[in-house]
Design a protein with these regions (language model features):
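Acidic, Pro/Ser/Gly/Ala-rich intrinsically disordered segments
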Residues: 1-3, 27, 76, 106
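Structural signature of alpha-solenoid helical repeat scaffolds
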Residues: 24, 31, 63-64, 103, ...
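Structural signature of tandem alpha-helical TPR/SEL1-like repeats
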Residues: 48-51
Length: 225
C-alpha cells in the first residue's frame, strides 16, 4: 500500500473526510476508488459513493477478496441509509464471512450490525435481538460502537423500552462525536427525535392530547411481558 493511500485511510479513520479525499481525488486505482466512495458516503453524497464503490469492487483483483468484501459492506451501508431493502442480504452475509475468515473482525462486526439493522427495518425483532446478543461492542472503534447502540435503541423503541432506548442513544451520541462522522451524528439525532415527538393521542372525557413514547409505555395497554 503506497503512502498516499495509507495517509488517506488514516485521515478517513480520524474523521478528516476532506483530507482523505484530497489525497486520492485524482486517482482511479481500486484502493483510491474505495476510499473515495467511503468518504463520499460519509459526506452524504450517496449516489456518487455507490458508483465509486461498485467501480472499486470491480477493480480489485480475484486475490483481493477482503478488499472486495469491504466494498460490499460499504455498499450495503449506503443501501441501508437509503432504505433500499432490495440489497441482497446474502451478499452482505458472504462479505461478513469472508472478512471473518481473513481476520478482519472489525469490518465483520460492522457487516453484522448492518444485517441486524436490516432485520429491524423489516420487523424481525426477535432475530435481530438474537444476533445482537452475539456481538461485543467493547473492542470496536467509535463509529461501530455508535452503530451498535443505534441497534440497541432501535430494538428498545420498538419494544417500548424507552429508558433503555434513551441510554443507548446517549452512548451512541458520545461515540458518534468521537468518530466525527456527520452522517452518523445526523442518524443519532434523527433517532433521538423519535423519542421527543408525539407518537400517539390520548382521548379521554372528550379531550385529546398527544403522548410521547414514555407516556405510551406507561399506559397499561402498552405494557409487554
Amino acid at each position: 500500500m503506497d503512502s498516499l493511500i495509507t495517509a488517506a485511510a488514516r485521515a478517513l479513520a480520524t474523521g478528516d473526510l476532506l483530507g482523505a479525499l484530497k489525497r486520492v481525488a485524482l486517482r482511479d486505482d481500486a484502493p483510491a476508488l474505495a476510499l473515495r466512495g467511503i468518504a463520499m458516503a460519509r459526506l452524504g453524497d450517496l449516489p456518487r459513493a455507490k458508483t465509486l464503490l461498485k467501480s472499486a469492487a470491480r477493480a480489485f483483483g480475484p486475490r483481493e477478496a477482503v478488499a472486495r468484501a469491504r466494498c460490499v459492506v460499504a455498499e450495503a451501508e449506503i443501501a441501508l441509509v437509503s432504505r433500499d431493502l432490495a440489497f441482497p442480504a446474502k451478499a452482505l452475509d458472504t462479505a461478513r464471512a469472508t472478512l471473518e475468515a481473513h481476520g478482519d473482525r472489525l469490518n465483520a462486526a460492522h457487516a453484522q450490525h448492518l444485517a441486524i439493522r436490516r432485520l429491524l427495518l423489516i420487523g424481525r425483532l426477535d432475530e435481530a435481538e438474537r444476533k445482537l446478543a452475539g456481538l461485543d461492542p467493547a473492542p470496536l472503534p467509535a463509529a461501530s460502537k455508535a452503530a451498535h447502540e443505534l441497534v440497541v435503541a432501535g430494538i428498545a423503541i420498538r419494544r417500548l423500552q424507552i429508558k433503555t432506548a434513551r441510554l443507548a442513544l446517549t452512548t451512541a451520541a458520545r461515540a458518534a462525536r468521537e468518530a466525527k462522522i456527520p452522517a452518523l451524528l445526523a442518524e443519532v439525532a434523527s433517532a433521538s427525535n423519535v423519542l421527543n415527538t408525539p407518537a400517539a393521542r390520548l382521548i379521554a372525557r372528550g379531550r385529546e392530547r398527544p403522548l410521547l413514547l414514555e407516556e405510551v409505555e406507561a399506559t397499561p395497554a402498552s405494557r409487554t411481558t
